[in-house]
Amino acid sequence: AVDFVIAEPNDWAVNKIQQIEGELLQPETVLPRFSKHVTGFERDLPLSELLGTIARKRYSQFPLYNKGKFEALITLRVIGFWLAKESQKGTIDLTRKKAADLIFKDGKYTNYRFVSASTYIFEVEEMFREQGTLEAILITKDGNPNGNLLGIIRPRDIYHQVEKD
């Protein structure tokens, strides 16, 4: 039968097809969606002061700088690992510890990447899929680690959006 219909278009399906078409023709870039103020700290900041700020402001990830030059991304996981290592030496004394003490140079992996403001969101999704240890993607104008931070993307920022769709 020529008039046999295999599917009836409905508003949801039509809207979804139009959304997909829009994403293919004009992929969304990381900015403005992931634009946000990112607080960073200098490596010589006393660790007790840094931990106090984390507790007060509930930061979970933040960049560490050496005189304005990016050095590392510190996360709660990194702090937990550092505390576990330090506890093996006995009582943990924070009096002379600096933020820089949290930086591990074991060369195992990098938990961050930098991207430019013009990076497509689908590229960021791919980065998170391909690098399971990635905890954050930091956004600068041109992807330069020492550039002004314009935003940060965590895996949950991407995947919460996917769940909403």
What are these regions (language model features)?
Residues F4, V38-F41, F70, Y112-V115, ...:
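Short N-terminal micro-motifs specific to bacterial/archaeal maturation
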Residues D11-N15, S48, G147:
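Short, well-ordered alpha-helical segments
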Residues I20-H37, T75-L134, I152-D165:
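Tandem CBS (Bateman) regulatory domains
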